[in-house]
């Protein structure tokens, strides 16, 4: 298996520190709002990588944190007239709802930064003691010049960074590129007691501390969105390696951005979508397959038209699964014949090809293509004359290859019922808003698929015709 390591800018053989075990840390959300589709891609990508590592037999300890104290949290809490803790509690709950709906497996642990204050203060104290950090008026800064390999992850040159950092620089810092690892308390801000007075941690120290305390001095994989490479991950490396004198993470993985209609997603451009908004209209399988339809290191373009295309492709996959499920009930032949044994062995080549693609830096786009090829083959060669064993083998193989991607696991009957109920809710909403055109379109679209809606005093009922 090969992975692209941002630290070395090349694909490397994946060799974890302990054979058969993987320690993986992914930077999670700042819990002040619902997560958007850009965040969703990061979460889906690394959930898939974790699933695939487990599929290949690794035991994965997967940590994804919650940043529950930082400037954004404080600003939002003040705007809403609530506390930072209450805001964090609320949006952690909302995160779990959306992540569960997106079929993202729960992490081994989701630590909150505020649960690690004692450990963070110890971390900061150790850096001061070792000469890598200094305190001024209750603020503590990390001295980037003291860490000789600063910039090694992002390829940034410290001298060039210093030239670019001289605008609005804090004059108290010894160097413009020094960054805060402990911040003194400001009015109306939550704070904790420390040897430097009341204050709170800087963002970068939080992840370093949680990774150290939950996974140890050196971890196998550290991952996150590409926007975190600098300065967040660069600063994590500096702090962690300055403290321990050991390599912080062996492999660094970064997922690329999501653009919306070929533009960067932003609220000002009115092209900002939360995952929850999309999941109200599309099944999780659709959003996951869309997110995985490009290589994780390549930017993808998001649009409703592209989601519709993904849904149509996914429907074809599920139609084939549905046909196989029906066939399993209908076929009479039992026991694999000689030619079926041979054909079953031929189907194994798809599994081998799938593993080959995923072993090459988790190439989900090509892996999905392999699943389509498998289904085309099965559609052509498995019929009512096939044996139950062969039909079941093909069905199980399709689901097996879909599993690491988090797709194709639903019973088609359950999936259909779920979609119909979702469309009924959408139609009810349209009627409430007097959008009769949309309400009629949903009804007519369902009728074309053989689903008739009946409006009754007890609510909307549906039946297949």
Swiss-Prot record:
Could you tell me what this protein is called? Cysteine--tRNA ligase
Enzyme Commission no: 6.1.1.16
So which cofactors does this thing need? Zn(2+)
Record-annotated residues binding Zn(2+)? 27, 207, 232, 236
Write down the top EC class of this protein.
ligase
Q: Which GO terms describe its molecular function?
A: ATP binding; cysteine-tRNA ligase activity; zinc ion binding
The listed location of motif 'HIGH' region is 29-39
Q: Print the keywords alphabetically.
A: Aminoacyl-tRNA synthetase, ATP-binding, Cytoplasm, Ligase, Metal-binding, Nucleotide-binding, Protein biosynthesis, Zinc
Which subcellular locations apply to this protein?
A: Cytoplasm
Q: Which organism is it from?
A: Clostridium botulinum (strain 657 / Type Ba4)
Q: What is its main location?
A: cytoplasm
Subunit-structure text:
Monomer.
Q: Which SUPFAM superfamilies match?
A: Anticodon-binding domain of a subclass of class I aminoacyl-tRNA synthetases (SSF47323), Nucleotidylyl transferase (SSF52374)
> GO cellular component terms?
cytosol
Any one of the GO BP annotations: cysteinyl-tRNA aminoacylation
Q: Which reaction does it catalyse?
A: tRNA(Cys) + L-cysteine + ATP = L-cysteinyl-tRNA(Cys) + AMP + diphosphate
Q: How is the cofactor bound?
A: Binds 1 zinc ion per subunit.
- Name the InterPro entries on file: Cys-tRNA-ligase, Cys-tRNA-synt_Ia_DALR, Cys-tRNA/MSH_ligase, CysS_C, Rossmann-like_a/b/a_fold, tRNA-synt_1_cat_dom, tRNAsynth_Ia_anticodon-bd
Encoding gene (name): cysS
Identify the residues that bind ATP.
Answer: 267
Task: Answer yes or no on keyword ATP-binding.
Answer: yes
Motif 'KMSKS' region, which positions? 264-268
């Amino acid at each position: 298996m090969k992975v692209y390591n941002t630290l070395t800018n090349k694909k490397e053989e994946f060799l974890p520190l302990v054979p058969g075990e993987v320690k993986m840390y992914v930077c999670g959300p700042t819990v002040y709002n619902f997560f958007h589709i850009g965040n969703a891609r990061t979460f889906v990508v690394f959930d898939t990588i974790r699933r695939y590592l487990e599929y290949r037999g690794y035991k994965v300890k997967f940590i994804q944190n919650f940043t529950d104290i930082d400037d954004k949290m404080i600003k939002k809490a003040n705007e809403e007239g609530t506390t930072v803790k209450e805001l964090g509690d609320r949006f952690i709950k909302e995160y779990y709802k959306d992540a569960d709906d997106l079929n993202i497996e729960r992490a081994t642990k989701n630590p909150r930064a505020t649960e690690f204050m004692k450990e963070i203060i110890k971390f900061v104290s150790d850096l001061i003691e070792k000469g890598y950090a200094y305190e001024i008026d209750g603020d503590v800064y990390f001295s980037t010049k003291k860490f000789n390999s600063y910039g090694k992850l992002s390829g940034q040159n410290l001298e060039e960074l210093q030239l670019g950092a001289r605008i609005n620089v804090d004059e108290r810092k010894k160097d413009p590129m020094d960054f805060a690892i402990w911040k003194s308390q400001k009015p109306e801000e939550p704070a904790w007691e420390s040897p430097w007075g009341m204050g709170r941690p800087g963002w970068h120290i939080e992840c370093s501390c949680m990774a150290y305390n939950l996974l140890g001095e050196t971890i196998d994989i550290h991952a996150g969105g590409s926007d975190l490479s600098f300065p967040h991950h660069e600063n994590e490396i500096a702090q962690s390696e300055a403290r321990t004198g050991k390599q912080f993470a062996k492999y660094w993985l970064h997922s690329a951005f999501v653009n919306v209609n070929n533009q960067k997603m932003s609220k000002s451009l009115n092209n900002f979508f939360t995952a929850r908004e999309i999941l109200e209209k599309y099944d999780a399988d659709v959003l996951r397959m869309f997110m995985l339809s490009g290589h994780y290191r390549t930017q993808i373009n998001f649009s409703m038209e592209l989601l519709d295309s993904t849904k149509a492709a996914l429907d074809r996959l599920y139609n084939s699964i549905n046909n196989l499920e029906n066939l399993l009930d209908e076929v009479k032949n039992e026991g694999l014949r000689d030619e079926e044994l041979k054909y079953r062995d031929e189907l194994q080549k798809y599994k081998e090809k799938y593993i080959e693609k995923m072993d090459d830096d988790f190439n989900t786009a090509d892996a999905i293509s392999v699943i389509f090829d498998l289904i085309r083959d099965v559609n052509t060669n498995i019929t009512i004359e096939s044996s139950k064993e062969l039909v079941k083998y093909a069905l199980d193989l399709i689901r097996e290859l879909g599993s690491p991607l988090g797709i194709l696991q639903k019973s088609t009957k359950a999936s259909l019922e779920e979609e119909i109920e979702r469309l009924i809710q959408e139609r009810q909403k349209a009627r409430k808003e007097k959008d009769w055109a949309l309400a009629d379109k949903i009804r007519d679209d369902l009728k074309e698929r053989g689903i008739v809606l009946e409006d009754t005093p007890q609510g909307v009922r549906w039946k297949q015709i």
